[in-house]
């Protein structure tokens, strides 16, 4: 899935769109998504000027965005002005390796539980096969009206 299709499933846009490509997607199971981390990211000038590191919260957000794509695709719907997937919870977060400019962040997110419009996931973000971040995520699909 390229960026043109991804933006059909995510409301995020620059500078907060953190999924560049979906490599694999098994509906109701898992997604494998990619974020190319470049020196042009808007957060690097401040985090940190002489040693740029991608903020851990944005790595977790990138996994949550991948989870949202998986959820919408699995439900067979696209977000619109009346629906949104909210990041509802996070547990067991571990940051194991810094993510720096030039890295390709490979995010694998699997659905571990779903009930009505609430989904739980296990996410692992890797760089060159090495775990950078792992977390348990929870998202909720909400209808806005």
Curated annotation (Swiss-Prot):
Pfam families: FabA (PF07977). The keyword Magnesium does not apply. One of its GO terms (molecular function) is (3R)-hydroxyacyl-[acyl-carrier-protein] dehydratase activity. It catalyses: a (3R)-hydroxyacyl-[ACP] = a (2E)-enoyl-[ACP] + H2O. One of its GO terms (biological process) is lipid A biosynthetic process. One of its GO terms (cellular component) is cytoplasm. Its EC number is 4.2.1.59. Coiled coil: none annotated. Its main location: cytoplasm. It is found in: Cytoplasm. The keyword Lipid biosynthesis applies. InterPro entries: FabA_FabZ, FabZ, HotDog_dom_sf. It is an enzyme of class 4 (lyase). The active site is at residue 47. Keywords: Cytoplasm, Lipid A biosynthesis, Lipid biosynthesis, Lipid metabolism, Lyase. Involved in unsaturated fatty acids biosynthesis. Catalyzes the dehydration of short chain beta-hydroxyacyl-ACPs and long chain saturated and unsaturated beta-hydroxyacyl-ACPs. Belongs to the thioester dehydratase family. FabZ subfamily. This is 3-hydroxyacyl-[acyl-carrier-protein] dehydratase FabZ. It comes from Azoarcus sp. (strain BH72).
